[in-house]
Structures are given as structure tokens and as C-alpha cells.
């Protein structure tokens, strides 16, 4: 699996994300942290460097497991005291059961049809699914060089992703779940949108 430098190194990944989100970086994680009570199992799908765990959940009474296809990220998570498994969500294996199933800024990897992944997350969740996804993206910039560079930097090993969600297309995806969507809100200075769904 050939990945961009950003996805090969946790520190570079974090540095890039901090640059993109600036003062709103921490808000990406606290918005999720506030929705998760103590004493539950959390499954973080496509967890990347597991920043949700290391920043928010590690010191709480939460049974956290992160899944990611990047073995280096998973090894870092385990070294930090969490549970992690190398897992390619594309293989359609049922996801491990948990109370809360989370995905942050990774749903675009499953375009053009991300609904089957959301359905598998719902099947694994006992209480809720929490999804956050960018709705403002450099990869869709009108500046061709900026867009091409952003797509290349965010290649997680499945090829540069040309497509991203807008707020309209993301809302359309979650509209199909009707009343099962119990919350939707812009977070991180309006760069991302958060959705909470019941199983």
C-alpha cells in the first residue's frame, strides 16, 4: 500500500491538520468527546493517529478501539495504551460491536457511495454512530495546483481522491436516514459537520 507522506507519519499528519484547522483543531475532538459518556465501548473507524483517544478519551473510563489500514498509526495507538487493529474498511467484513461507533473526516474515501459504510457502522453500534466530515476542502479548491496538491497529500493508499463532500451532498446522504439522525451541527469553525445517528 503506497500512501502519501502525510499518512506515513503521525507527526506530519498532526502538523498538517493543525495548520488546516488552526484555532479550531481541538474543537474537532471535543465535539465528539462531549457526546460520549464514561463506561462505554468506542470503536473509532479509520482512526488515523487516534487523536480522539490521546487527546480526549485515554484518561476516561472508556474501552476504546481504533481501526485503521495504516499499521504505523495502529502501532502508535497501541504504544499510547489504546487498543488498535489493522483493518481495511473496504473489505466489507462486519465491524466489531461497540456502544458508540465513530468516524472522523474519512467518509469521503468511500465516495461515490458512502451509504454502505454508514450502514455497517450502524449495524455495529449499540447506542449511536457519530460521523464528522469536512464540508470545506482544499481538494476541491478552484485553484488547480492547490486542489491537486491537497488530493495528493490526502492519499491514504487508495489513490488520490478527486471527490469530496459539500454540505449539500453530505446532508443528502444523511437525509436518507430520516429520524434516525438525532443531531447535525457544524463544528470546527464551520469546516466540518457532525451527525449523530441511532442504530
Can you say where each PLM-predicted feature lies in the sequence?
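Hydrophobic adenine-recognition pocket in adenosine-nucleotide-binding enzymes
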Residues: 106-107
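A short, conserved alpha-helix within the catalytic core of class I
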Residues: 110-121
Amino acid at each position: 500500500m503506497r500512501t502519501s507522506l502525510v499518512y506515513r507519519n503521525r507527526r506530519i499528519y498532526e502538523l498538517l491538520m493543525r495548520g488546516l484547522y488552526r484555532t479550531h483543531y481541538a474543537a474537532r475532538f471535543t465535539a465528539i468527546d462531549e457526546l460520549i459518556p464514561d463506561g462505554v465501548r468506542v470503536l473509532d473507524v479509520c482512526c488515523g493517529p487516534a487523536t480522539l483517544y490521546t487527546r480526549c478519551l485515554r484518561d476516561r473510563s472508556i474501552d476504546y478501539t481504533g481501526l485503521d489500514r495504516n499499521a504505523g498509526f495502529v502501532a502508535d495507538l497501541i504504544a499510547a495504551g489504546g487498543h488498535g487493529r489493522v483493518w481495511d474498511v473496504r473489505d466489507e467484513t462486519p465491524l466489531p460491536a461497540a456502544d458508540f461507533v465513530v468516524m472522523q473526516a474519512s467518509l469521503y474515501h468511500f465516495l461515490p457511495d458512502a451509504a454502505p459504510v454508514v450502514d455497517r457502522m450502524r449495524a455495529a453500534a449499540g447506542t449511536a454512530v457519530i460521523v464528522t466530515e469536512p464540508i470545506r476542502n482544499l481538494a476541491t479548491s478552484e485553484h488547480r495546483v492547490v486542489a491537486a496538491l491537497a488530493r495528493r497529500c490526502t492519499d491514504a493508499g487508495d489513490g488520490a481522491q478527486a471527490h469530496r463532500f459539500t454540505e449539500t451532498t453530505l446532508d443528502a446522504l444523511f437525509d436518507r436516514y430520516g429520524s434516525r439522525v438525532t443531531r447535525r451541527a457544524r463544528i470546527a469553525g464551520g469546516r466540518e459537520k457532525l451527525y449523530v445517528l441511532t442504530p
